[in-house]
């Protein structure tokens, strides 16, 4: 019985940057570090930071004036930022640079009064933050989730129209939505390359490859992790038995019955230690062969943190 690891898997550059910002802030400041929303969507990571004294809040109003706040990797709306400034908070922005790029484009559309369409999942913090970059009352930003939303969409002025996407969507589904938009609105413009990030793309491509050489796939990632959920959905679409788990304790032995090759991947916010624990658990259950890593993309992207947060080792 074999264990095959997807490549790439686990932390992306945006998550690594966000974690480094908080870890360094804990070393530099002698005050409580507050984080608006979960820094990244992984319960293990959040609990680890909580044990170090980090306080997570959903409402910026719950943070005392003159405190230190970290904006999560998902980004925040302009309103949240204004509230933080009004409370005289020291802002440490851990927003993923790829999300910031989308924010800047949406803000530009807003400034120019161009109606804008955002493809994304309703209620996701990244989507809330991105929609919150559009504040021109003369224009409008529309959120769509699927092709049915495209069919029902009504635009006042479609001579100039822009679209953008959440960074953690299914590539396949998003491409079909974009095609539907371009078919309905001939003058629509979008980014040269869709906003889905490199890490999301690489992990989705990897799970497709993994599905061809395994008969079960375990996706490690929290339930509220968008990119992990997309990986799980994609694994199921390939026809391979796929389960999304938070940790090794979620694994049921019945899943492994008559399985010879078990594939493991992890969402962009899931740490390596969770993968290691799953491997250790599987070995106890009979998967004795050393795990093999499949061939895949080598990720070399690094996002720098603010200079004032650099810590000398």
UniProtKB/Swiss-Prot annotation:
It catalyses: isopentenyl diphosphate + 2 oxidized [2Fe-2S]-[ferredoxin] + H2O = (2E)-4-hydroxy-3-methylbut-2-enyl diphosphate + 2 reduced [2Fe-2S]-[ferredoxin] + 2 H(+); dimethylallyl diphosphate + 2 oxidized [2Fe-2S]-[ferredoxin] + H2O = (2E)-4-hydroxy-3-methylbut-2-enyl diphosphate + 2 reduced [2Fe-2S]-[ferredoxin] + 2 H(+). Keywords: 4Fe-4S, Iron, Iron-sulfur, Isoprene biosynthesis, Metal-binding, Oxidoreductase. The gene is ispH. This is 4-hydroxy-3-methylbut-2-enyl diphosphate reductase. [4Fe-4S] cluster binds at residues 12, 96, 197. Binds 1 [4Fe-4S] cluster per subunit. NCBIfam families: ispH_lytB, PRK01045.1-2, PRK01045.1-4. The active site is at 126 (proton donor). Its cofactor is [4Fe-4S] cluster. Catalyzes the conversion of 1-hydroxy-2-methyl-2-(E)-butenyl 4-diphosphate (HMBPP) into a mixture of isopentenyl diphosphate (IPP) and dimethylallyl diphosphate (DMAPP). Acts in the terminal step of the DOXP/MEP pathway for isoprenoid precursor biosynthesis. Transmembrane segments: none annotated.
């Amino acid at each position: 019985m074999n264990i095959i690891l997807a490549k790439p898997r686990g932390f992306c550059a945006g998550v690594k940057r966000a974690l480094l910002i908080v870890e360094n802030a804990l070393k530099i400041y002698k005050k409580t570090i507050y984080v608006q929303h979960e820094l990244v969507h992984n319960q293990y990571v959040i609990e680890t930071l909580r044990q170090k004294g980090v306080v997570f809040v959903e409402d910026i109003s719950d943070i005392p004036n003159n405190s230190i706040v970290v904006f999560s990797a998902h980004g925040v709306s302009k309103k949240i930022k204004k509230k933080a400034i009004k409370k005289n908070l020291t802002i440490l922005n851990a927003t993923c640079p790829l999300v910031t790029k989308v924010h800047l484009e949406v803000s530009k559309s807003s400034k120019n009064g161009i109606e804008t369409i955002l493809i994304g999942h309703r209620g996701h913090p990244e989507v809330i933050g991105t929609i919150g970059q559009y504040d021109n009352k003369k224009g409008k930003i529309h959120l769509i989730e699927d092709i049915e939303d495209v069919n029902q969409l009504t635009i006042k002025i479609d001579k100039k129209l822009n679209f953008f996407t959440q960074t953690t969507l299914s590539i396949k589904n998003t491409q079909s939505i974009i095609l539907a938009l371009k078919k309905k609105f001939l003058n629509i413009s979008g980014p040269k390359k869709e906003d889905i990030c490199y890490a999301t793309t690489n992990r989705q491509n990897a799970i497709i490859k993994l599905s061809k050489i395994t008969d079960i796939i375990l996706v490690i990632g929290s339930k509220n992790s968008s990119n992990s959920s997309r990986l799980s959905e994609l694994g199921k679409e390939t026809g391979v038995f796929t389960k999304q788990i938070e940790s090794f304790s979620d694994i049921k032995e019945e899943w492994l019955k008559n399985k010879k090759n078990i594939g493991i991947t992890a969402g962009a916010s899931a740490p390596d230690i969770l993968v290691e624990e799953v491997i250790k658990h599987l070995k106890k259950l009979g998967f004795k062969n050393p795990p093999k890593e499949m061939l895949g993309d080598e990720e070399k992207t690094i996002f720098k943190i603010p200079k004032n947060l650099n810590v000398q080792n």
